[in-house]
A protein has these predicted regions:
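Short coil/turn motifs that cap or connect alpha-helices
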Residues: 16, 42-43, 55, 165, ...
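Conserved SAM-binding loop
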Residues: 21, 94, 112, 147, ...
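Asp-based, Mg2+/Mn2+-dependent phosphohydrolase catalytic module
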Residues: 2-11, 103-106, 119-224
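Helix-loop "lid/cap" segments that line or gate small-molecule binding pockets
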Residues: 35-36, 55-69, 126, 158-159
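Short beta->alpha linker loops
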Residues: 27, 51-55, 93-97, 118, ...
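Metal-dependent phosphoesterase signature
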Residues: 42, 47, 64-100, 108-110
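Active-site neighborhood of HAD-like aspartate-dependent phosphohydrolases
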Residues: 5-49
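Conserved phosphate-coupling serine/threonine residues in phosphotransfer and NTP-handling enzymes
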Residues: 20, 116-118
């Protein structure tokens, strides 16, 4: 674990979902590639990595720019979603320490919130599969904001819904886009990198970079 420390007492912990709590990013990569291939198109890892932490509107914009057609972008997205939804039914797994750290934080009296670029129906489905959705006291999803991550709007709204100032809130993220959103919002940011390593400038802006969520509660409590 790398830690930079902090100055304000944390009262709320707000989690990203995809790649942070549930291992959806790997399934998503497989689904994007399979969906594109069925349409006779290629899609590379570098493009898919741009989707991580983004809202559907942003993802569609990236696809349209790459393929030059709204119809092609929509076809790839629709087929990818069909494939991914089937995979989620049998292959979705929790990230290590997800359930344990939620229980620890709630027991310690922290407000626990969710801030995900996924739509509400997707977040509810994926987290209810593991009995976690009802643990979140506030939920902010992709359809709740105009500007998705890395814009700070989602975390500013999540802090407002939690009832705390950004400097009283910790953000838990796996991706560059998510971390930048939390940092720009003025929150404490704890990163647990998933598929794509974080660039050094993002690492420098985080309070801590953790190996797993098992380390999170102690790291949050260490901020004074």
């Amino acid at each position: 674990m790398q830690a930079n420390g902090g100055t304000e007492m944390i009262k709320a912990v707000i989690f990203d979902m995809d790649g942070t709590l549930v291992d959806t990013e790997r399934l998503g990569i497989k689904a994007w590639k399979a969906g594109a291939a069925e349409l006779g198109l290629a899609i590379d890892d570098a493009l898919i990595h741009q989707f991580i932490g983004r809202t559907l509107v942003d993802v569609m914009g990236i696809l349209e720019e790459r393929y030059g057609s709204h119809e092609i972008a929509e076809a790839i997205y629709v087929r990818h979603k069909e494939i991914r939804d089937e995979m989620v039914k049998t292959e979705l797994e929790l990230k290590a320490g997800a359930a344990e750290c939620l229980d620890e934080l709630l027991a310690a009296g922290y407000h626990v919130g969710l801030a995900t670029s996924s739509r509400h129906v997707t977040a509810e489905r994926n987290l209810k599969a593991f009995g976690l959705f009802d643990k979140f006291e506030t939920v902010t999803c992709g359809e709740d904001v105009v500007h998705g991550k890395p814009d700070p709007e989602m975390y500013l709204l999540a802090c407002k819904r939690a009832g705390f100032a950004p400097e009283e809130c910790a953000v838990v993220e796996d991706s560059r886009n998510g971390c930048v959103s939390g940092i720009t919002a003025g929150c404490h940011v704890f990163a647990v990198p998933d598929i794509v390593p974080l660039p050094q400038d993002v690492v420098d802006g985080c309070d801590a970079v953790l190996d797993t969520l098992f380390e999170l509660t102690a790291a949050v409590k260490d901020v004074r």
